[in-house]
């Protein structure tokens, strides 16, 4: 076998069909574009989103106000009522809550929310507290420490 014997695989070099070159050529007259209408004209087709003259969807729906916050901080949140099961004077952190099985997945820094009641004094260390959560923890005799 020599280099001049190498030929492409049979059927791999299919010639493109030349359309619109007379009726006897097979694809003459309308060149596979059907009868009349917008899709058979030159420069054919409609723009994306065109719905045949009906008001398109992107113009029917309202423009929404505002914009998304780019670097939004995602917190792992927990309510004060979940902390009520812990023993008194426990130091509460994200790691200790995961070890205790109260939290299963941590998406980010810990934030304490104020839903429910707390009757136990706890030393809570978290990235953020709501006002209600802070007042309930301190009313129970505990302390709140914001981690930076």
From Swiss-Prot:
Q: Membrane-crossing residues?
A: none
Q: Does the keyword Amino-acid biosynthesis apply?
A: no
Region: Disordered, residue numbers: 1-57
List, alphabetically, the InterPro entries matched: Ribosomal_uL15 (IPR030878), Ribosomal_uL15/eL18 (IPR021131), Ribosomal_uL15/eL18_sf (IPR036227), Ribosomal_uL15_bac-type (IPR005749), Ribosomal_uL15_CS (IPR001196)
GO molecular function term, any single one: rRNA binding
* UniProt feature, compositional bias: Gly residues: 23-35
Gene Ontology cellular component?
Answer: cytosolic large ribosomal subunit
Gene3D superfamilies named in the record: 3.100.10.10
GO BP terms, alphabetized: translation
Any coiled-coil ranges, and where? Answer: none
Give the keywords, sorted: Ribonucleoprotein, Ribosomal protein, RNA-binding, rRNA-binding
Biased composition range(s): Basic residues: 10-20
PROSITE patterns, per the entry: RIBOSOMAL_L15
Family annotation (NCBIfam families): rplO_bact
Task performed by this protein = Binds to the 23S rRNA.
Q: Spell out the subunit comment.
A: Part of the 50S ribosomal subunit.
Task: Indicate the family of this protein.
Answer: Belongs to the universal ribosomal protein uL15 family.
The protein's matches in PANTHER family, at most eight in alphabetical order, are given as:
50S RIBOSOMAL PROTEIN L15 (PTHR12934), LARGE RIBOSOMAL SUBUNIT PROTEIN UL15M (PTHR12934:SF11)
Record-given protein name: Large ribosomal subunit protein uL15
């Amino acid at each position: 076998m020599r280099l001049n014997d190498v030929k492409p695989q049979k059927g791999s070099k299919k010639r493109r069909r030349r359309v619109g070159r007379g009726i006897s050529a097979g694809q003459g007259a309308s060149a596979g574009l059907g009868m009349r209408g917008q899709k058979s004209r030159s420069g054919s087709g409609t723009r994306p989103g065109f719905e045949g003259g009906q008001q398109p969807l992107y113009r029917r729906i309202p423009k929404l106000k505002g914009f998304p916050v780019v670097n939004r901080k995602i917190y792992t949140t927990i309510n004060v009522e979940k902390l009520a099961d812990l023993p008194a004077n426990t130091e509460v952190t994200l790691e200790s809550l995961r070890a205790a099985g109260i939290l299963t997945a941590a998406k980010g820094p810990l934030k304490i929310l104020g839903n429910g009641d707390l009757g136990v004094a706890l030393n809570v260390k978290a990235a953020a507290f709501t006002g209600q959560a802070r007042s309930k923890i301190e009313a129970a005799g505990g302390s709140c420490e914001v981690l930076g």
